[in-house]
């Protein structure tokens, strides 16, 4: 079974459900990621809520977090909140899920500075082949949703590929099938790759 790396559909049991700390209401049999979205970085007073939620055993990852140059608080504030998520990810030994818009330079600079031990997952990756290589070379996993660059999808190293739905109505297997076509491999092969990569990243039992 293919586990959805990132969704906002709280009814799912075959996915990592992304929620804000204020809305975190864990249910048995479900797995979550919790974080302060870059668009909400003006709300840093509830970081204490995040710290409490993140420690819950049903939380598989921290985020989504990152930097968005088109929306949210000023870049310095977003970067500061991003750094706090990194520290939390490292202290709890849970991977980090990234939301990044036109801020590749900041993300890579902070990663180089912080030297994190935990995996980073770039959710909803839509970049080109060059960007995919740059991120993969820096150890970042790339999660593809319903919109992606087909050449990039074909080029992502096998050990860096993940699949998600985010807020799309497209099913996870539908997206995986399109990725398989780009890579000229079978759907079961994509499912196996993505499942293994996610399991390794989050110690998640598929």
Place the predicted regions along the sequence by residue:
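Mid-domain alpha/beta scaffold segments of enzyme catalytic cores
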Residues: 1-206
């Amino acid at each position: 079974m293919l586990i959805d790396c990132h969704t906002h559909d709280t009814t799912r049991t075959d996915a990592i459900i992304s929620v804000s700390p204020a809305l975190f209401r864990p249910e048995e049999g479900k797995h979550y990621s919790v974080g302060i979205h870059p668009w909400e970085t003006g709300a840093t007073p509830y970081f204490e809520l995040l710290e409490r939620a993140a420690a819950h055993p049903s939380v598989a990852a921290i985020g989504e977090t990152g930097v968005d140059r088109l929306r949210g608080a000023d870049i310095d504030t977003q970067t500061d909140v991003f750094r706090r998520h990194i520290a939390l990810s490292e202290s709890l030994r849970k991977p980090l899920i990234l939301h990044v818009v036109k801020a590749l330079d900041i993300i890579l600079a902070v990663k180089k500075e912080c030297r994190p031990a935990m995996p980073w997952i770039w959710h909803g990756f839509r970049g080109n082949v060059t960007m995919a290589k740059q991120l993969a070379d820096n150890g970042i996993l790339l999660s593809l949703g319903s919109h992606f660059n087909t050449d990039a999808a074909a080029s992502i190293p096998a050990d860096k590929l993940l699949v998600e739905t985010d807020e799309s109505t497209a099913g996870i297997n539908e997206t995986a099938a399109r990725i398989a076509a780009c890579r000229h491999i079978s759907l079961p092969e994509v499912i196996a790759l993505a499942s293994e990569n996610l399991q390794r990243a989050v110690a998640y039992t598929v």
